[in-house]
Amino acid sequence: MKIVFLLWLLVASVWPVVAQPSSEFEAANKLFEQGRFADAAAAYERLLTNSPTAALHFNLGNARFKSGQPGKAIFHYHQALRLSPRDPDARGNLQFARRSLGVTVDEPLARHLLRLHTPDEWARLAGAGLGAWFLLLALGETLPAKRAAFAWLTKTFGVIAIVSASLLAAAHWERRTAGLAVVVVPEAAVRPGPLAESKAAFTLRDGTEAVVLDAKDDWLHVRDSGQRAGWVKRESVWRLP
């Protein structure tokens, strides 16, 4: 069961999804329904250590948002979308949380298309295309008289396999290089260098999403949507894996 708290519609209900294995999940949902959002968040966090699912991340994001922790909510909505990239509820709540902070994130079309599927889904699609291509090649060798009839299908599945494999590689590359971190403290000081003695150049508030450029010891080099860059303490942000 997943609590579908649609921030953008301001309603809350319970939808059936992939069943969670323990009554603790239902107990956490009950805490949320009772308005005990901090307690619900703690309960969802405990469950995440054993069975991280899109439903858990989604519900935890809702509990964090209602607890006044927009950064942690945004982090968990991202995690839900990593596991279930076409979930309209997680995407809708992520956009609502951003708008509540006065933030608009323009995602490049190529990145949006890559994230419509998980890397595992791209791998399955590539594998299916490759398998069908080899099967048609084998049939063409076994039945020479039918080779011409299979030609267009063979070419089609060959193209599907190549394109899917390319998208799989691109999806893995995008996840490795487009590192994202979310500020989870009320205000994070951004410094010109990875030194506590450096004077803060500017600050990032709770919920700000930033691209991770580099890392050194307890510091991350980040760039915000306004193209400002600097170093923040790791403890100030949660980095998406």
Provide a role label for each language-model segment.
Residues 70, 153-185, 192-195, 199, ...:
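Boundary regions of SH3-family modules and the immediately adjacent low-complexity/disordered segments
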Residues 103-144:
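Membrane-embedded alpha-helical segments of integral membrane proteins
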Residues 202-234:
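SH3/SH3-like beta-barrel superfamily modules
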